[in-house]
Amino acid sequence: MSWYPGHIEKAKRQIKDLLRLVNTVVEVRDARAPFATSAYGVDFSRKETIILLNKVDIADEKTTKKWVEFFKKQGKRVITTHKGEPRKVLLKKLSFDRLARVLIVGVPNTGKSTIINKLKGKRASSVGAQPGITKGIQWFSLENGVKILDTPGILYKNIFSEDLAAKLLLVGSLPVERIEDQRIFERAFEIFARSIGIESSFSEFFEDFARKRGLLKKGGVPDIERALMLFFTEVAQGKAGRVSFERPEDITPVQQEQTRGV
């Protein structure tokens, strides 16, 4: 994958330096793909770490419960949340120690900026649908004196598999317009179809989707490119309903090693 804004690489280097200033890390992950959206390449193992599964309202409920148990069995602290959850509920779940100095991280479009703004109690930073929109690194404080460090989203410089790229596409962490490899679209559709029980082939599904949405070229030919753009944008936004794109039992030891912090 060639898409990798320079500010994300810069932030990754800075985060390694800033880890010495904090004692707690909150990893914001998309509940629809908790493994794929943990792809940092930064080792947080020496810090108290909270895995925050965001967007649980658009993830499959049973699968989310499996992920919570999966992380708990690994001895990790995990909480769940969503955009509509009140600030006081989120703060209670996080239950930071008064002396906490917190680093909040997340790959693009996991909802990290929304979490940050909710904790601030006001919409103080730019929140948008484009991955990597928050470019600065800054501190802010909660009412009880807890200090929180905001960071941009982080992605691997090298997305090492079609499977990972496909899942990041499905949750919106990779911009759909930057995908140049048809195989990634095909793999993403395969994952989506398996998740909700679609039996149509890739070509059948998108030809039908294009016709239903009026995405046609001259002569009534389905515009597959526009169909792909619209479909994957809507899936990332949660318009396909409550669906998860990976399960704990599908993650192999090799995959876990590939995404281990460095």
Curated annotation (Swiss-Prot):
Give one GO term, molecular function aspect.
GTPase activity
Subcellular location per UniProt equals: Cytoplasm
Pfam families for this protein: MMR_HSR1
- What GO terms in the biological process aspect are recorded for it? translation
Binding residues annotated for GTP, in chain numbering? 54-57, 109-114, 153
Alphabetized UniProt keyword annotations: Cytoplasm, GTP-binding, Nucleotide-binding
Tree of life domain: Bacteria
Q: Domain CP-type G: where? A: 12-157
Primary location recorded for the protein, binned into one broad class: cytoplasm
Recorded hits in CDD domains, A to Z, give: YlqF
Q: Name one GO cellular component term.
A: cytoplasm
What biological function has been recorded for the protein in this entry?
Required for a late step of 50S ribosomal subunit assembly. Has GTPase activity. Binds to the 23S rRNA.
Per its record, how is this protein called by name?
Answer: Ribosome biogenesis GTPase A
What is the gene name?
rbgA
